[in-house]
Amino acid sequence: MSVQVPLDELQEKSAEFGWAYLLTVRDDLRPHAVAVSPTWADGALVMTVGRGSALNATARSSITLCFPPVDTTGFSLIVDGTAAVEDDVVTLTPMAAVLHRPAT
């Protein structure tokens, strides 16, 4: 079950969650997931990452954040966006967001 999150409501909705997984794609096209603590700045999500995530996001700028549910019956928040990378900081400009949980 998925519910669209309007981008103008995303910052408020993301405040209900804590940390997130940053999903990037490696050179061999395998996914790479790391835990991050994104913050908001100028309408974008900003996070400090390691070398591998920074290289991946530089090479392939389509990235995703997945905020896990607060409890086992809750929704995950999934945010797709475009990355800008400067040193070890990735800035995700949101393009789409959904709340998702398994169908019951």
PLM feature spans:
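Sterically constrained small-residue positions within well-ordered secondary structures
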Residues: 13, 29, 38, 56, ...
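Short, basic/aromatic recognition patches
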Residues: 1-19
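Short beta-strand segments
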Residues: 17-49, 78
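Short, structured beta-strand-loop surface elements
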Residues: 42, 50-104
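A generic structural signal for ordered alpha-helices
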Residues: 7, 16, 35, 57-59
